[in-house]
Amino acid sequence: MPKKSGSASGRNLRIADQIQRDLAELIQREIKNPAMGLVTLQSVSLTPDYAHAKIYFTVLGAEPDAAAAILNEKAGYLHSLLFKRLHIHTVPTLHFHYDGSVERGIEMSRLIDQANASRAKDD
């Protein structure tokens, strides 16, 4: 009988993906707070025992700290809604974290463009 290598990590990824899809829909439909802006979920990371989920998001039209505070305040409510949708033994505790990688990428691109322009001027 062949060994099932990596099946746990595959399941972990499938559940994380399902949580991301469901949460994106629930946040859009259930959280009506204009101070939160437009939230986009970037990724979900689950612990191996499915007890905790780190949800990384970006936000448009609001302060990231304010959006994170609102999402973490509503985490219990979102958890209860997820519980009704997911058919798994343990629905993880939700922890929302702002993903600043997009802004860092834009800043890095700007610095590279600036360095290239400076080098072209020197030549």
Curated annotation (Swiss-Prot):
Keywords: Cytoplasm, Ribosome biogenesis
InterPro entries named among the record's database cross-references: KH_dom-like_a/b (IPR015946), RbfA (IPR000238), RbfA_dom_sf (IPR023799)
Location within or outside the cell: Cytoplasm
Cross-referenced Gene3D superfamilies: 3.30.300.20
Pfam families listed in its UniProt record: RBFA
One GO MF term attached to the UniProt entry: ribosomal small subunit binding
Any single Gene Ontology cellular-component annotation: cytosol
A biological-process GO annotation: maturation of SSU-rRNA
Domain of life: Bacteria
SUPFAM superfamilies: Ribosome-binding factor A, RbfA
Annotated S-S bridges: none
Keyword Cytoplasm attached: yes
Subunit structure, as described in the record: Monomer. Binds 30S ribosomal subunits, but not 50S ribosomal subunits or 70S ribosomes.
Similarity annotation: Belongs to the RbfA family.
UniProt-listed HAMAP family: RbfA
Protein purpose: One of several proteins that assist in the late maturation steps of the functional core of the 30S ribosomal subunit. Associates with free 30S ribosomal subunits (but not with 30S subunits that are part of 70S ribosomes or polysomes). Required for efficient processing of 16S rRNA. May interact with the 5'-terminal helix region of 16S rRNA.
Name of protein: Ribosome-binding factor A
Species whose genome carries this gene: Ralstonia nicotianae (strain ATCC BAA-1114 / GMI1000) (Ralstonia solanacearum)
Lineage: Bacteria, Pseudomonadati, Pseudomonadota, Betaproteobacteria, Burkholderiales
